Amino acid sequence: MKKWMMAAAVVSLMALSACSNDGSEAIVETKNGNITKDEFYNEMKERVGKSVLRDLIDEKVLSKKYKVTDEEIDREIERIKEAYGTQYDLAVQQNGEKVIREMVKLDLLRTKAAVEDIKVTEKELKEYYDNYKPKIRASHILVKDEKTAKEVKAKLDKGEDFSKLAKEYSQDPGSASNGGDLGWFGPGKMVKEFEEAAYKLKVGEVSDPVKTDYGYHIIKVTDKEKKKSFNEMKDEIAFEVKRNKLDPATMQSKVDKLVKDAGVEIKDKDLQDVIEQQGKQ
């Protein structure tokens, strides 16, 4: 996340610098003196310029051979959201969604380049598919004791509204006001007992009370993603299986080779060791 924030500032700076050849143009004016475009550029270049320049070089070189679709970016962003939570939201607030999408695209370009030489078997792909569970959407009513849970379940069995009862009874401050809605989630996002019970339910079905360390849950599944066929998911699965085998050193080595083969020539003398330094990291 810190890398994305840093890149956002410098990429914006470079775009600003490209708009005009007049580096003496003031971008900040004060009573004690102005700050010119050149001063700003040079200061940012000194602080983080080499790291961001390498990102720009990688993107330019890799995008000639590898393509990343909007759908792939969307899917990766969902994965990042699940991993980083509020940190991702903060990154979007500070940098904007466009910058985040560009950095995700670059990461995917590097990964695609690196996994190109990794082999996977049909057996590995089918095992991944068999273990894959699509996301589900569920609501729940959380209470502290089994007696209350059974009372609530009895009311539901008589046809009372789940959302209304969640607002009345649920002890979960994060979902009670929304009628118990937990949104979409996949495997590993809920405690084991909750997840196992939820995945057994059909859409619209309500569970018996489920005990966890948090109390007793009554779960209702409200929607389920349809699991695509193996052939429909095969390319996506192959990418994930290969990525799971990938290590950072292999990725860097492959990207370095592609950059070297592209004949990159850096004109700014202060940045000429960017590629050499990256290879040593």
Curated annotation (Swiss-Prot):
It catalyses: [protein]-peptidylproline (omega=180) = [protein]-peptidylproline (omega=0). A lipid is attached at C19 (N-palmitoyl cysteine). It is a lipid-anchor. One of its GO terms (molecular function) is peptidyl-prolyl cis-trans isomerase activity. The keyword Lipoprotein applies. Its EC number is 5.2.1.8. Keywords: Cell membrane, Isomerase, Lipoprotein, Membrane, Palmitate, Rotamase, Signal. Residues 1-18 form the signal peptide. Belongs to the PrsA family. Plays a major role in protein secretion by helping the post-translocational extracellular folding of several secreted proteins. This is Foldase protein PrsA. It comes from Geobacillus kaustophilus (strain HTA426). The gene is prsA.
